[in-house]
């Protein structure tokens, strides 16, 4: 069984690899325990009346697109977004971040662009970048690897776990800005197979291909924090690697997506050029939905009013007893993580 076939990472093998690693992590201190579980969007360290959230992520092979056109100024936004959007899923307010850059050469212009992007992302998420590490590893790194880690804070009585999600609850979707920072192994394979130059105009778009692919990941922190005091949020999911399967990480229920966002042009064109089906697309990409919330049915009007004009938002579906994700419009049925 191949790890990558047709530009698609084998999620089963990836999951087995990760689980094997996690099973070795047997030591835990008796104090400052992890309230959550290893493998969630973020971990929560018990600090008494409050918890500190801690998680890390990176931009993956999206950085290779940036490297190919020497345009790095949005990667920092992506890195911040990938981390803070995970942190807020439990109701945490991200407060600080450290970054890690692994490069094969020292390029001052690249450093300037990367730093600019991180600074913009920090402003958007209202966090401080308090440190980091830059490693020049020409013998190890062929391209560039960008990642970071974020800490946040949440009162213990306000932690959002998804445990009280029930049948009849409403699924709210927040629109994505495009590809965000996932699925780029598949994207790069499709682009190469179709001999599409990054400087070419992207099919069905007025922008160049690299501009479409490098559109920065949307950051949802301010919008989520604004509504937490007025809406009872039962669960949240960041739609990243694994696509819509991430929704099931909130709780093992059936999530029926009756009215998804229309996928942006980039997804439709990639699906056509890559000869992929909708099931594959929804398991790899965000398909227009970057973040999902679950609330009581009687609060849907309030949340729509609260978020109107701030971020694309819509009532996408409902929760049923069962398991997995159903998207009837596209005849897609995805198994959950459980």
Curated annotation (Swiss-Prot):
Any single Pfam family the record assigns to this protein? AIRS_C
Q: Gene name?
A: purM
Protein name as annotated: Phosphoribosylformylglycinamidine cyclo-ligase
Pathway(s) served = Purine metabolism; IMP biosynthesis via de novo pathway; 5-amino-1-(5-phospho-D-ribosyl)imidazole from N(2)-formyl-N(1)-(5-phospho-D-ribosyl)glycinamide: step 2/2
Family that this chain belongs to: Belongs to the AIR synthase family.
Q: Which InterPro entries match?
A: PurM-like_C_dom, PurM-like_C_sf, PurM-like_N, PurM-like_N_sf, PurM_cligase
What organism does the UniProt record list as the source?
A: Thermoplasma acidophilum (strain ATCC 25905 / DSM 1728 / JCM 9062 / NBRC 15155 / AMRC-C165)
Entry's localization field: Cytoplasm
Q: What is the lineage of its organism?
A: Archaea, Methanobacteriati, Thermoplasmatota, Thermoplasmata, Thermoplasmatales
SUPFAM superfamilies given for it?
PurM C-terminal domain-like, PurM N-terminal domain-like
| Top-level EC class | ligase
């Amino acid at each position: 069984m191949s790890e990558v076939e047709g530009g698609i990472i084998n999620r089963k093998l990836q999951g087995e690899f990760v689980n094997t690693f996690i099973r070795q992590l047997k030591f835990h201190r008796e104090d400052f325990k992890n309230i959550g579980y290893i493998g969630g969007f973020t971990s929560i360290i018990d600090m008494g009346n409050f918890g500190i959230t801690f998680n890390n992520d990176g931009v993956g092979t999206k950085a290779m697109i940036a490297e190919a056109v020497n345009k790095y100024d949005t990667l920092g936004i992506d890195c911040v977004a990938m981390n803070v959007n995970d942190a807020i899923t439990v109701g945490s307010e991200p407060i600080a971040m450290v970054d890690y850059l692994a490069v094969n050469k020292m390029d001052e212009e690249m450093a300037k662009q990367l730093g600019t992007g991180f600074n913009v992302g920090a402003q958007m998420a209202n966090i401080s970048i308090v440190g980091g590490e830059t490693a020049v590893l020409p013998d190890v790194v062929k391209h560039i690897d960008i990642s970071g880690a974020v800490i946040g804070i949440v009162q213990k009585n306000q932690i959002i776990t998804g445990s009280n999600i029930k049948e009849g609850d409403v699924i709210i979707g927040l629109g994505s800005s495009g590809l965000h920072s996932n699925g780029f192994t598949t994207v790069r394979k499709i682009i190469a197979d179709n001999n599409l130059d990054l400087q070419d105009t992207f099919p069905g778009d007025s922008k160049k291909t690299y501009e479409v692919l490098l559109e920065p990941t949307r950051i949802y922190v301010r919008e989520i924090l604004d509504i937490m005091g007025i809406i009872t949020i039962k669960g949240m999911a960041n739609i990243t690697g694994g696509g819509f399967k991430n929704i099931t990480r909130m709780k093992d229920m059936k999530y029926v997506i009756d009215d998804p966002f229309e996928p942006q042009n980039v997804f439709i064109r990639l699906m056509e050029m890559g000869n992929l089906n909708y099931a594959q697309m929804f398991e790899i990409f965000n398909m227009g939905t970057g973040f999902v919330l679950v609330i009581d049915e009687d609060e849907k009007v309030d949340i729509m009013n609260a978020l109107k004009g701030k971020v694309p938002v819509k009532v996408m579906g409902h929760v049923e007893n069962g398991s997995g994700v159903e998207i009837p419009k596209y005849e897609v049925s995805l198994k959950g993580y459980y």
